[in-house]
């Protein structure tokens, strides 16, 4: 009689899980001569099982074994949901349809990457993936015990899904069905456009997959540009010479892609950095600055290797880096991908060195009477053409015109790191008629361009210098009695430095009108900051600035409303008039009480604030077209009693 004993055991890798099946056959023959052999075989078999269970026997297996041996139809609802979410995501934005088996293999490759395995597996080196922040999804396999699962990084998942062409485990027929467009080099047939990529990212962030995400992070921020060039590196060959080329090459490396010209530092990618599970992800990934350029000519379909001689080295190009700060951590509320910095209701407490705002203009035929918006969150500013004259003063007799606009501030958090509500900013090119919106999921290059703009502004405006006390330049006008409307109050501002003739800028202040302790009051927070129109300029005495970028962009203003009101309503305006001349200019504001307060407003003040603010109405006024940086002081006016105090503030 023959007895076959089949023992199945599972391998638990340290960093990923797959199934390895060992078949132990012990042939027991009904013969006394073979009894001692069968006993010895049984003993050795049991010994092997015990040693395997305590993970003392080392072995290797194909990462695909997990899905090759597990019937996906036996998965739990959650596993199946994850799988089909990812498959639908792929098939929705790729023109080549994949079979379930082929996509299963792709997905398995994504899940199975051992990012801590530094050994070369065919043409793929996985150690650089260690630098990616670890936001992971854990899917438990139904055919195993509870602690058997597959782990996938949500940050590398989507990109790896579209980069499986470099894996050695995929079958050739499956690889041929995976045409990817990576770095503008058409290795295969797929047409993955920027728009489809952005939509895929958005769909990915809103899918059910995010419900199982848990946050991890590493010391280095995730960089999509760096990651895809890591893939480029891996499609060459896994030989020491290539390793040395990238590790020892001058940094950064300037490469042309279908998304523009980008800078990547391979040395930082190839440096292993341990992950940390103690902090949440803290900042949107900021790729190197891209300048739009035509896509490079396509590579033939059979060209599966990209050689290093196609990469141009530019050692003198500055590298922009970011750091995690505690203040940024306070902003992030979610770990979804792409993750927003904060919601409009989350006003973070930050150390702000500079408040800057980007403005967008709407081109309408009648600039004097723009439609009054109903949703202030997405409203854009328009400045009537009548504001372009040199007159810089207003008075109470002028007609009040409803010119509604709102502002969103992009706040400098730490060094050259900026944040903005909803993680979106607007840029407008001189050569374009329309305004283009960029979000974090689509592109973060404008933030770096904005940083370059800040360096330019810093060059000419010296906003880091100490603020001068200009309280003596107030034209102090106070309220006469509680039964009268407030008169116009003015503040004289002297520009600090005259700008070059080819640079125009506007600096405005935002003032908070608080009525305390009265409950029958309202206030709106108004923030008006600087607007810069760039032309090509020299920065020879300062840090290197990319002139092409400066010439291509004009910072513009986005919109957000922050207003609290009760009765009686009291509208509030604040505006500045700063020209390139050295003469003082006037800031005016007015308090218009619609009704007489029932009780004295003992602590009504006009003061500086750092919050995201909104100005809802402006008076019909004229304004200089050329404006510049200046030091200003804010004024506090108490209605009852009539006292005036001054406070110096830097804009």
From Swiss-Prot:
Residues 275-292 have a biased composition (Low complexity). Keywords: Glycoprotein, Host cell membrane, Host membrane, Membrane, Signal, Virion. Glycans are attached at residues 74, 97, 147, 208, 223, 234, 254, 302, 355, 378, 395, 469, 502, 520, 546, 603, 620, 631. One of its GO terms (cellular component) is membrane. It comes from the Viruses. Residues 1-56 form the signal peptide. Residues 275-303 are annotated as: Disordered. Belongs to the herpesviridae U47 family. This is 120 kDa Glycoprotein O. It comes from Human herpesvirus 6A (strain Uganda-1102) (HHV-6 variant A). The lineage of its organism: Viruses, Duplodnaviria, Heunggongvirae, Peploviricota, Herviviricetes. The gene is U47.
